[in-house]
Structures are given as structure tokens and as C-alpha cells.
Amino acid sequence: MTVGKLMIGLLIPILVATVYAEGSPAGSKRHEKFIPMVAFSCGYRNQYMTEEGSWKTDDERYATCFSGKLDILKYCRKAYPSMNITNIVEYSHEVSISDWCREEGSPCKWTHSVRPYHCIDGEFHSEALQVPHDCQFSHVNSRDQCNDYQHWKDEAGKQCKTKKSKGNKDMIVRSFAVLEPCALDMFTGVEFVCCPNDQTNKTDVQKTKEDEDDDDDEDDAYEDDYSEESDEKDEEEPSSQDPYFKIANWTNEHDDFKKAEMRMDEKHRKKVDKVMKEWGDLETRYNEQKAKDPKGAEKFKSQMNARFQKTVSSLEEEHKRMRKEIEAVHEERVQAMLNEKKRDATHDYRQALATHVNKPNKHSVLQSLKAYIRAEEKDRMHTLNRYRHLLKADSKEAAAYKPTVIHRLRYIDLRINGTLAMLRDFPDLEKYVRPIAVTYWKDYRDEVSPDISVEDSELTPIIHDDEFSKNAKLDVKAPTTTAKPVKETDNAKVLPTEASDSEEEADEYYEDEDDEQVKKTPDMKKKVKVVDIKPKEIKVTIEEEKKAPKLVETSVQTDDEDDDEDSSSSTSSESDEDEDKNIKELRVDIEPIIDEPASFYRHDKLIQSPEVERSASSVFQPYVLASAMFITAICIIAFAITNARRRRAMRGFIEVDVYTPEERHVAGMQVNGYENPTYSFFDSKA
């Protein structure tokens, strides 16, 4: 009994220690690797993951409900200042988080299930996936594609549905992970594991196992060889991929793009040097063989030339392809940043208008409106610069890109006009802000945009193209309550509405929230017709009112190039008139600049009567020249008089004193009896 009690006393602590050792890893495994994550829920304060593995509420009241990707990236950097946050990615599943606080701060008692965002620290590394038995691993990766997390999740599901297991079972996605990032929360591919819905029948496997042993051995050998080759390829691909594709540094995007181009050119130069070195070795071999076997040497030379040309052409094609990939990624990142800036500027402008209702603040509204105009104009300038670059680099791609340029330039002006139209709900604010904003818009465009209407630039072909001239010409019908002016000939050529709709659908990526605001405004309904601009004369009837000029009706008279063209244009204009009768016509207050030529004619954009300005400048030109000549004559006469006076003053003789002031002083002292002590000293010595 004593021995038994002693054994029990020794075994109990051992069992307790064993249970604790087995249980402690399970409990601490949750916090074994810290993952920086942030979570958002509108109406509540943001939360972020601490290093202990618990969710913490943000202390700031205004840090709430972020939806833009750039805002989320900035918040990640703010929540984790010690980390190098370079990108974000949605978490793979929703997480239930408790203790959500209202924006006011308390109480903190709500629980929500949200999908947090993983803040990528440093270089992006894809998650390692486990492949269970009877499951298959696969991946989809293309540098030409750049899509978000949800797209690659759906793509993984589609790929697994097309696969079959060994037992001819349908397969589903077990796990997946996105691959290399190409932009903010955008990725180039996905890797996934597909598993069968049901486990395979073990009895069937045992029956066929003995018959298929030999085949399995061969398949295993083949799979080993294939895996070795694929491993070699996988090892080569990351080394050849430029770091620019892996990490997106939004603050230094332009510098990173230039460095990536330099690295790409350096790699291409090294490859060409290597080929030239091989060519030199082959040339030496050819010369040696030519002395021994001339026919064989000529055959070898022809093969060598063909191989060399093929190698050089493949290197050039690879270099062009890599350059296009880098430019495409750069364009996408820049456009994403521009869209994010426009979105932020629109949000600030609307918030300033909402604040102005309770607390008038004209300065804040004006500053936010200027910031929005700057964001739109930067997008416009970027579009023009990209088109100019494509004209120099690839004319075919530039021709394909031209409709997008037309669409973007048109909608940039429409969005800015729609933003200005939001001021109509505040008459006092509109009277103060609108003239300043319109003047600032014109001055800023004059400053940042090239003078395309005068300058002989690369955009000249697109300016003189008829299709490009259609981008901002609007024919807006007046309400039925106004007096109808006398109609003139209207041979305008009207584009079908289906074309404009398809154009909008093709470029939804560049749409902004301002378009939706304009469309949703109840007292604004307009019929827009895009008209060819080759006018002989344009007559505009303007109804004068107290607040703003209102465009009543415009009639355009175009040149007659062809009889067929005239007939088609007249029929199209008649059909449009019939449609206008069936549509309820409402008044639309628009800027006078809309009825002027397109936005790229920047001098005429914001001037209602450019003829007056031109006539005024021609009248004052002689006066300016006469005043300049008069001032020049006065300057010449004054210079001549001054020069004559100087010459007159220089005439005569000037007495020159050969003695220095010291010598004159010593001579004066000697006259008064002064003797040099040095001389007297030497006289006494002698």
C-alpha cells in the first residue's frame, strides 16, 4: 500500500505536467505569429489587431468607415507606424469582432461580423497551402491580368469545377491564396487546392491498386521529372521578375518606374552582349573551319546567321513585351492614385457643402472646390501625356487609345460642370464662389496644359479630326414656356445614342461620383446631342436673367461636303426633332463655356465672346507700338546727353602729385627741424 501510494503521488504531477504541456501550445498557437489587420464598420470606430492578438478600438472619433483602398493603406500605416506597410489584401473569411464603439465613444457593446484587411508588411509573400491526399494543387498566373481578391476567388472556384478527381468525382476549392501584387489590393494570379466532395471508395482503390502498380511507378517517375522541371522554372521566374511588380510604393511611383525601366534596359543590354560574344566565338570557329572544309563552313555560316537573327529578334520582342508590361502597371497605378485623389476631393467638397448649411464657411468650400478642379485637371494632363507618348512609340496603340482619350476629356469637363452645378442649392454661396472657381479653372488649365490650338504638337492630328471635335458640343433644348426663336437650317450630324451608351459602358472605370450626382438631381434633365463642329456661323440666343445666363437654343450651319452626307445628316436631324417633341423639355442652366469649342481649345473655353477680345487687341496694337517707340527714343536721347557731359568733363590738364602722403609728411617735419633718429645713431657710431 505504501509503495502504491508513492507511485500514485509520483504519477499525478507527471500527468498534470503532460496535460499542461499538451494544452499550452494550443492556447498559445493563436498568438504564435502576429498578423497586422484592420477592420471597419460604418457608424462605429475602427479596430486594429494588437501584437497580443486582440482587437483594439481606435481612440480617434473621426477615423471611421473607410472604403477607399488608399485610405485603408494610409490607416494601416497609421495603426502600425513601426512597420513598412506596402499593400493591403482582404482577409480570406469574415471575423466576428466584439466591443464595437459608436463614433461618440461609448458604449462599446456591439458585435459585428466583418471581413478585415490584412496589412502587408514589407515584401508580399503568398500563403503556403497544404495539399491533402486525393487533392490537387494548381494555379492561374498571368502578368497581363490584374484583378482584385474577389475575382481570383471566383476564378479558383471555376477552375476547380472543371477538374475531376481520380474517382471521377467533382472537386471544390479547399483553400486558395493570391499571388504577386500588381497594384493596391490587386493581384496577378491565384494558387488553390481542389479536393473532391466525397472521399473516394477505399474498396475500389484496393481492387485496382495491384493492377496499376506498374503504371503508378511510371507515373510517379514522370511526375518527379515534371516536378523537378517545374521547380526549376519556378526558381527562375522569381529571379527574373523585377521588384517593381512585387511592391507598390505609392509615394515614389514615378522614381520606381524609372528605375524599373533602367533595370530592364540593363538586363537587355547584358543579354545582347552575351549573344554578341557567342557570335564572336562562332565567327572564330567559322574561320577555322573555312580553311579545312569550305562547303561545310558555308553551311555552318548560314545556320549561324539564321540562329543569330532568331535570337536577336526574340530578345527585341521580349524587351518590347517587358516594357509594355511595366508601362501598363505604371499606368494602372497612376490612374488608381488619380481616381483616389478625385474621390477624396469630391468627398471633401460635399462635406464642406454640408457643413456650410449649419455654419457658413465660403473659404472652405472654395478651397475644396479648387482641390477637386486640380485633381480632375491632373487626370486630364496625364491622359494627354500618355496619348502623346503612344503617338511617338506605337501609332496603332495610339489609334486604339484615341476613343478613350476623347471619352475622358469629355467627361472631365462634364464632371467639373456638374460639381459647379451643385452650388445652385446655395445662391449666396454660388454668387461668391462660382466666378472665382471658374477663373481658377481657366487659369490652372492655361498653366498646366499645352497650348494645343496654337502649338504644332503631336496632338494636332486628333484636334483636326472630326470625331475629336465632337467631344463637348451640346445642343440643349429650352423649356416650352420660353418664346421659341426663329429656326435656321440645322444640318448637324448627330451620333446615335447607342454609341454614347456603349462608350460609357466601355469606360466605367473612369466614371466619378459626380456623374451620379448630376444624374440624380431632380430638377436637372437634359438631352445631349454630340454635334460635328465645322461651323460657318453659330448663333446663340441668350435669355438675360438676374442670376446666370441661360442657353435657350443653338442652331449650327455646317459645310456641305457631299450630297449623300447632307441627306443622311438632314434625316438624322429630322428624326431627332421628332424625338424632342415626345420628350418633356425642362430648363437646364449650363455654363456658357459648354457651347464653345472643345475643352482642349483652352483659350476659347471660358470666353463667351472671343471676337470682342480679338477686335480689342487689334485696336490697341498700334498704340502699344507707338508708346514703345516713344520710350525707346527718350532712352536714346538721355544716353546721348549723358555721354556728351562725361566727355566734356574729361577735357583739360590734371596736376599729378609725384609724392606720397608719407613723403610729404616727412618733408614737412624736416622743415621744422626733425631729424631721423636712425641717421643720428649711425653717425654717432661712426
Swiss-Prot record:
Glycans are attached at residues 84, 201, 249, 417. Residues 32-125 are annotated as: GFLD subdomain. A motif (YENPXY motif) lies at residues 674-679. GO terms for biological process: axonogenesis; body morphogenesis; central nervous system development; ecdysis, collagen and cuticulin-based cuticle; nematode larval development. InterPro entries: Amyloid_Cu-bd_sf, Amyloid_glyco, Amyloid_glyco_Cu-bd, Amyloid_glyco_E2_domain, Amyloid_glyco_extra, Amyloid_glyco_heparin-bd, Amyloid_glyco_heparin-bd_sf, Amyloid_glyco_intracell_CS. The keyword Methyltransferase does not apply. It comes from Caenorhabditis elegans. Disruption phenotype: Larval lethality during the L1 stage, with the formation of vacuoles in syncytial hypoderm, organ morphology defects, and molting defects. RNAi-mediated knockdown results in a reduced body size, transparent appearance, sluggish movement and insensitivity to touch. Delayed development and a molting defect that begins at the L3 to L4 larval stage transition and continues through to transition from the L4 larval stage to the young adult stage. Increased sensitivity to acetylcholine inhibition. Increased pharyngeal pumping. It is found in: Membrane; Early endosome. This is Amyloid-beta-like protein. PROSITE patterns: APP_CUBD, APP_E1, APP_E2, APP_INTRA. Disulfide bonds join 42-65, 76-119, 101-108, 135-195, 146-182, 160-194.
